[in-house]
Design a protein with these regions (language model features):
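Short amphipathic alpha-helix used as the core "switch/output" element in two-component signaling
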Residues: 39, 61-74
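Short hydrophobic/Thr-rich beta-strand motif most characteristic of the beta2 strand and flanking loop
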Residues: 25-32, 40
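Acidic catalytic/metal-coordinating carboxylates
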Residues: 32-36, 59-62
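Charged docking surfaces used in two-component/phosphorelay signaling
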Residues: 15-23
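Alpha4 helix (beta4-alpha4-beta5 surface) of REC/receiver domains from two-component response regulators
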Residues: 62, 85-102, 113
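The feature encodes the CheY-like receiver
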Residues: 14, 56, 86, 105
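Active-site beta3 strand of CheY-like receiver
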Residues: 44-50, 55
Length: 132
C-alpha cells in the first residue's frame, strides 16, 4: 500500500481528498503547516507528497526545496497544488522540484491519476536537480 502525505491548511480539502485516496487503497497522512511538513515527511516516509503552495509558517515552494536537499526525501515525488491563478506558479513548482502541478479546484480523480503517473515512474528516480 502506497502512502500519500497531504500538506494543506484546508480541513475540507484534507478530508475530501483523504477519503477519496483511502478509498483507492492509499494510506493517507496529513499535515497543515509548512513548519511541520519536512518533519512529517521524515516521520511518515511517504511514497509521494501533495503540497499546497499557501501554508501557515511558510509556503510549499520552500518546503519542496528543503525536501530536495534531504537525502531521505530527495527522490520522493512532490505534486504542488494551489487555488492561485498566477500563471508563473507551474514553472515555479517545477523549479522547486515538483513532478506535477495542479490548480484547485480539481476533481479527486485528476489528483489520483496524477499520483498514479508520478508513482509509475518507478523506484529508479534520481534526486531531482534543482532547476536554475
Amino acid at each position: 500500500m502506497k502512502t500519500v502525505l497531504l500538506v494543506d491548511d484546508d480541513n475540507v480539502f484534507l478530508l475530501a481528498i483523504g477519503v477519496r485516496l483511502k478509498s483507492l487503497g492509499y494510506t493517507v497522512c496529513t499535515c497543515k503547516d509548512a513548519a511541520f511538513a519536512v518533519s512529517a515527511v521524515l516521520k511518515n516516509n511517504p511514497d509521494i507528497v501533495v503540497l499546497d503552495v499557501s501554508l501557515p509558517a511558510g509556503d510549499g515552494f520552500l518546503v519542496a526545496e528543503r525536501l530536495q536537499k534531504l537525502p531521505a526525501a530527495a527522490t520522493t515525488p512532490i505534486i504542488i497544488v494551489t487555488a492561485s491563478e498566477n500563471p508563473e506558479l507551474p514553472e515555479r513548482a517545477i523549479k522547486a522540484g515538483a513532478v506535477a502541478f495542479l490548480r484547485k479546484p480539481f476533481d479527486a480523480a485528476a489528483l489520483a491519476n496524477t499520483i498514479e503517473t508520478a508513482l509509475a515512474q518507478g523506484d529508479d528516480r534520481q534526486p531531482r536537480a534543482k532547476a536554475v
